[in-house]
């Protein structure tokens, strides 16, 4: 391929702390009334002093460790100075010179995407426009609730080789965030926000375009689409011999294009300097170690364990570990059923027909004991697998036990050999031509007789018993 994209991501993760980064206001503000979770600190009133959140640091360290970063014992906050209506202080408290962590990576499909740094900072407020398109808005309102909500900003190296890989990186990162419990990772709620930097290399001339920043992408799909569009735009400009401007562009959902927003800022535009109201935060290696020891099992580790301990295929383990809730519920069921493979089959073929991997499995009406009872009914021959699927659906919807459902619906397998034989004898008498054809070698007609019994018993006959009796009566 002549033209190759070079992509790096800047990802802002809202941390699930109880309070904001530097004050005691609640951090979970998504559903609150506008401007109801604010105080003199997060709105930048004169004389109000910030105090860093310990929980913010703990969550940041867990995230940095999960992303294989070197965690720095010495960190310091700085002021990033710029004007925007949703930034009441006129500056943002961030970590520019001495970040929390450096030099990490996230492994994706066997390839390492390097992480340059992770730093802690505070969020800005939120502008609410009178129109979905800012260019068409007649007015804008400011909600300061989000001011001071703690963020971890993750900056990757430009190692991402395609828009699809960028999407996959974000999906895997969100999975890790949710396993750690440090963030919901909900893009639609602003808990995970991504800006992308893209340039394009012409491999024939070894010429590389200027870097373009792309913003306003509020879903993984839109990140991929925006980068696909921008790659084509830059590539076409290079083919035409035009210079690609170094700028910030925004994804326009209505036109499925990017539009120019402003020229790209440089670091010196922000006039960074040390935050005078917060002393440096110095952590000992022992303190960092104690926090890292709280690390839960991560998705890749859990997947490997499922394959090893439960003898699952990579495909099965991938799906069952796609969310922590699903993986935990699977293990709860295996503990009761003592049958990992059968439990996996029912999760993949039945449970996930009704639930997504991100569901709250603690709230399901179907419980681990129901899986065991269902498997026992199948293994004892009281119900067939087809009937079991019907039973499963009813248990899932109502929370009744499988035995109750079987009794109420009267769908226990008919294992009475004399009844099955009676039905088959009548069929043989009514279909002498098919009996003769079968005896002359058309063995596929066995299915006709077995199917007839199943139809008359409404699927309740034991197929194994039906097969045996049919073959005996047909002379096999």
From Swiss-Prot:
InterPro entries assigned to the protein according to its UniProt record, in alphabetical order: Asn/Gln-tRNA_amidoTrfase_suB/E, Asn/Gln-tRNA_Trfase_suB/E_cat, Asn/Gln_amidotransferase, Asn/Gln_tRNA_amidoTrase-B-like, GatB, GatB_C_1, GatB_Yqey_C_2, Gln-tRNA_amidoTrfase_suB_CS
Protein name per its UniProtKB record: Aspartyl/glutamyl-tRNA(Asn/Gln) amidotransferase subunit B
HAMAP family listed in its UniProt record: GatB
Protein role: Allows the formation of correctly charged Asn-tRNA(Asn) or Gln-tRNA(Gln) through the transamidation of misacylated Asp-tRNA(Asn) or Glu-tRNA(Gln) in organisms which lack either or both of asparaginyl-tRNA or glutaminyl-tRNA synthetases. The reaction takes place in the presence of glutamine and ATP through an activated phospho-Asp-tRNA(Asn) or phospho-Glu-tRNA(Gln).
SUPFAM superfamilies with a match to the protein in the record: GatB/YqeY motif, Glutamine synthetase/guanido kinase
A biological process from GO: translation
Catalytic activity: L-glutamyl-tRNA(Gln) + L-glutamine + ATP + H2O = L-glutaminyl-tRNA(Gln) + L-glutamate + ADP + phosphate + H(+); L-aspartyl-tRNA(Asn) + L-glutamine + ATP + H2O = L-asparaginyl-tRNA(Asn) + L-glutamate + ADP + phosphate + 2 H(+)
SMART domains given in the database record: GatB_Yqey
């Amino acid at each position: 391929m002549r033209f190759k994209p070079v992509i790096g991501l800047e990802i802002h993760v809202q941390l699930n702390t109880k309070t904001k980064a530097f004050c005691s206001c609640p951090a979970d503000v998504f559903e609150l009334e506008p401007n109801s979770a604010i105080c003199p600190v997060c709105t930048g009133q004169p004389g109000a002093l910030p105090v860093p959140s310990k929980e913010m640091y703990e969550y940041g360290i867990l995230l940095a460790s999960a992303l294989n970063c070197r965690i720095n014992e010495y960190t310091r906050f700085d002021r990033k100075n710029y004007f925007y209506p949703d930034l009441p202080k006129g500056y943002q408290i961030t970590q520019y010179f001495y970040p929390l962590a450096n030099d990490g990576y996230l492994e994706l499909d066997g390839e390492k995407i390097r992480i340059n740094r992770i730093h802690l900072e505070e969020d800005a407020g939120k502008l609410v426009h009178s129109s979905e398109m800012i260019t068409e808005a007649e007015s804008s309102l400011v909600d300061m609730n989000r001011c001071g909500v703690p963020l971890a900003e993750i900056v990757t190296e430009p190692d991402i080789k395609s828009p699809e890989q960028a999407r996959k990186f974000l999906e895997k990162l969100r999975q890790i965030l949710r396993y750690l419990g440090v963030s919901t990772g909900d893009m639609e709620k602003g808990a995970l926000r991504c800006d992308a930097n893209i340039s394009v290399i012409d491999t024939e001339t070894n010429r590389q375009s200027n870097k373009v920043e792309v913003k306003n992408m509020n879903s993984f799909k839109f990140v991929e689409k925006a980068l696909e569009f921008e790659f084509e735009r830059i590539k076409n400009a290079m083919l035409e011999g035009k210079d690609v401007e170094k700028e910030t562009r925004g994804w326009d959902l209505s036109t499925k294009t990017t539009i120019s927003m402003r020229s790209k800022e440089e670091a010196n535009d922000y006039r960074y300097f040390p935050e005078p109201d917060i002393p440096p935060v110095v952590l000992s290696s022992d303190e960092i170690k104690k926090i890292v020891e709280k690390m839960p099992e991560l998705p890749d580790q859990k997947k490997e364990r499922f394959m090893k301990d439960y003898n699952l295929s990579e495909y099965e383990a991938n799906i069952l570990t796609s969310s922590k809730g699903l993986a935990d519920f699977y293990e709860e069921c295996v503990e009761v059923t003592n049958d990992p493979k059968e439990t996996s089959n029912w999760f993949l073929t039945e449970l996930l027909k009704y639930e997504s991997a991100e569901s709250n499995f603690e709230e399901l009406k179907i419980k681990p004991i129901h899986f065991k009872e269902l498997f026992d009914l199948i293994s004892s021959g009281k119900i067939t697998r087809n009937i079991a699927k019907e039973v499963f659906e009813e248990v899932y919807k109502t929370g009744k036990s499988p035995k109750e459902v079987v009794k109420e619906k009267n769908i226990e397998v008919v294992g009475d050999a004399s009844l099955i034989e009676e039905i088959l004898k009548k069929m043989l008498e009514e279909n002498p031509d098919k009996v003769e054809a079968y005896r002359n070698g058309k063995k596929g007609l066995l299915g006709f007789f077995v199917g007839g019994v199943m139809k008359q018993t409404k699927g309740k006959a034991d197929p194994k018993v039906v097969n045996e009796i049919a073959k005996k009566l047909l002379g096999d």
